[in-house]
Each structure stands twice: as C-alpha cells, then as structure tokens.
Amino acid sequence: MALTSSVKEELSRLDIKKSSVRKAEVSAMLRFAGGLHIISGRIVIEAEVDLASTARRLRAAIAEVYGHQSEIIVVSGGGLRRGNRYVVRVVRDGEALARQTGLLDARGRPVRGLPSAVVNGSAADAEAVWRGAFLAHGSLTEPGRSSAMEVTCPGPESALALVGAARRLGIQAKAREVRGVDRVVIRDGDTIAALLTRMGAHDALMVWEERRMRKEVRATANRLANFDDANLRRSAQAAVAAGARVDRALEILGDDVPDHLKYAGELRVAHKQASLDELGRLADPPMTKDAIAGRIRRLLAMADKRALDLGIPGTEANVTPEMLDE
C-alpha cells in the first residue's frame, strides 16, 4: 500500500472520544475536501475524499457529533483519475452543518479559513485539524531527497490556518502557491515523523522510518565504494547508535513498556553488533527478522510519542556526536 493510503487508512481507524477534537477534525475535513452548493434553493455540503474508510469516518462523525444525516456517493475513476472517489453529501441539514462547522459565519457568509474556535483551540484540536486536512487532501512521499508531507488547500487563508496549527504543535510548515494551487509543505524528515506521531499514525510512522533508514543506509553504501578499516568502524558506530536509541526508549517508558517490546529492546542493547536475523535467532523462542524489527520500531515510536507528550528529549537524545562521527 502506498504511504499516503496507509497513513489515511490508519487515521480513519483512530478512535477519538473528545467532542471538541472530533469537531475540529470534521471542520478541517469539510474545509479541505468540501464545498458549498446551492441546489433547489437549499445549501448542500459535499466533501470528496479518495478512500472509502475516510468517507465512512466523516459520515459517522457528522451523525454522532452534529446529529445530521449524510450519504456517500461513489464516483468511478476514469481518464487521468485512477480509482474511485467518495463524496459525502449533506442535503437536508446542509446549512445547519455549514454554520456549526464554520463553513458559514453567523450572517451566512462563506468562511475562507478555519473557524476561530478551531484556530484558537487546544493542542489536541490542532492535531485534529492536521488529521482532518491530511485525510481530505494530504499526501506523503517516500523518504529521500525529495520526501515531503503536503496538503493541498482550497485557498491561502486555509493554508495559513494549517501553518498556524502546526506552529501550535511546535512544528514548522510552509505555505506556498504552486501553479495557482495553495499548498502546505513539510520536507524535513524529523518534522514529518513528529507530525505523523501527533496525528496518531504510529504504524505508518514505523513503515516510513524503516524506509527512511534503508535509504540512508543505501546512500551511505553508495558513497563508500571501497571500505577500509575506518569505514568499518563507522558501521560499528551506527550499530552502537541504534542500541543507544533503544536504551533511551527503555528509560523513557520505564515500567510501562510491554514485556514483548522490552524483551526485543534488551536483545538489541545486549547484542549491538548483531544483525536482525541474528537477533531473531538469539531470541527464546526464536523470532523472524521482521518480527524483531517490528517490535523494536514500535518500542522506539512509543517512547518518542511519550517523550513528545512529556516534553522531554526523545530516543535520539542518547545518540552522541561521537557515535555519528565520520
């Protein structure tokens, strides 16, 4: 599954209880995926998304949070557009929902950005804004030189609101116009990882981080065509750095770390030079390479999320310059 789809599928399954957070997400989804139409003299809301799971999430939230009914219309792909699209349409209560979600102001005029209640909301509301915007019109490219998280925006006002929401989370995003289309873009790998964590896409983050590490290893291998003793020492330093991250993860989580993740982490720390295959064979009972790698990735992601919530340094804090020294 493509990275963008895997992030959206995971976010669509995320269980959110707090009403204000769900409202912020719905407002963002309708703003970034939707539009207002006048049909037979009444206001109709339509929001077009690319995944059925996203459409179902939006429809459920509209019913559960606002008490309005909607329908999902499947638009078959054709021409340059691949795959089906899904339109969530609110007809009967379109105007009421538009006012409730900030698409219309108190005088019935269209709002170009996001409603002030959302813009000035909590950090959880800011996370919900990004979650809704990404579900509506976001994309995530493969890690590498041109990696980016991007959201296409309906206008400059909504783009600036999204940049502001990121800023409230301590994340730097840039608004730019490309060929007449407003976009908000994040290119820094660590920043992308932090935002995936804040949105709640922890499984997708682990996949993205794994691919990112592979790219970095491959790039390093390409640069070092002829290995000498110094290069071999650097490889050993990288392994030590990985063990240091796990050390920090165990320290952050303390007694809260699940036993199976703790066991995988302790194996990594105890055998810093071992490959994942070797770690799997050292486990009791033995595990596959993918199983041990998955547990270590989940341990690091869980620790970094906890560190982010507590406002303390994450797992990278244990990686010293000497470990990365070339």
UniProtKB/Swiss-Prot annotation:
Which Pfam family is an annotated match for this chain, by its short name? Answer: WhiA_N
Per its record, how is this protein called by name? Probable cell division protein WhiA
InterPro entries attached to this UniProt entry: Homing_endonucl, Sporu_reg_WhiA_N_dom, Sporulation_regulator_WhiA, Sporulation_regulator_WhiA_C, WhiA_LAGLIDADG_dom
The alphabetical list of record keywords is:
Cell cycle, Cell division, DNA-binding
Q: Which organism is it from?
A: Arthrobacter sp. (strain FB24)
Which purpose does this protein serve, as stated in its record? Involved in cell division and chromosome segregation.
Q: Which residues bind DNA?
A: 275-308
Between which residues do disulfide bridges form?
Answer: none
Gene name of the record: whiA
Q: Which family does it belong to?
A: Belongs to the WhiA family.
Task: Name any Gene Ontology BP term.
Answer: cell division
GO-annotated molecular function: DNA binding
Q: Does the keyword Amino-acid biosynthesis apply?
A: no
